[in-house]
């Protein structure tokens, strides 16, 4: 049995399959999930696990070269906006509708139990060398 890192076997396996340039959408419980990308649904109850917890866990295991979020997060969810700004100084912002369109091209979608609006970020995988 694994003793550290991401223990969810579906998520750990999906992360191992990612490559440079692949997209990973980390989303709240209300984000529409498009057909196509692989989905690992971690939502258990409203707020569990939180968006911040999941992003933190993913960043411990992934190299991220870019991140995109919805412009609306700035006004609708200041706490999430501050988190994203702190983690991703070069955060790109697009309208929420555009983020939903971009999510269709993600390789992986990780759905959290987050119950606050616009807690979504599309990560672009980098390389460790």
Curated annotation (Swiss-Prot):
Annotated TM spans: none
Gene3D superfamilies (alphabetical): RbsD-like domain (3.40.1650.10)
GO terms under biological process: D-ribose catabolic process
Entry's EC annotation: 5.4.99.62
Any one GO molecular function term: D-ribose pyranase activity
Catalytic activity: beta-D-ribopyranose = beta-D-ribofuranose
Family: Belongs to the RbsD / FucU family. RbsD subfamily.
NCBIfam families: PRK11797.1
Stored HAMAP family: D_rib_pyranase
Quaternary structure (record): Homodecamer.
Protein name (Swiss-Prot/TrEMBL): D-ribose pyranase
Native organism: Streptomyces coelicolor (strain ATCC BAA-471 / A3(2) / M145)
Taxonomic lineage of the native organism: Bacteria, Bacillati, Actinomycetota, Actinomycetes, Kitasatosporales
């Amino acid at each position: 049995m694994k003793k550290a890192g991401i223990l969810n076997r579906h998520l750990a396996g999906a992360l191992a399959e990612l490559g440079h340039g692949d997209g990973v959408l980390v989303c709240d419980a209300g984000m529409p999930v498009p057909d196509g990308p692989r989905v690992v649904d971690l939502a258990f109850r409203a707020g569990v696990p939180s968006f911040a917890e999941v992003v933190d866990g993913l960043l411990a295991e992934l190299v991220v070269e870019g991140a995109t979020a919805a412009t609306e997060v700035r006004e609708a969810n200041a706490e999430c906006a501050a988190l994203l700004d702190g983690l991703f100084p070069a955060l790109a912002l697009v309208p929420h509708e555009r983020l939903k369109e971009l999510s269709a091209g993600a390789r992986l979608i990780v759905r959290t139990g987050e119950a606050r609006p616009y807690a979504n970020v599309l990560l672009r995988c980098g390389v460790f060398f």
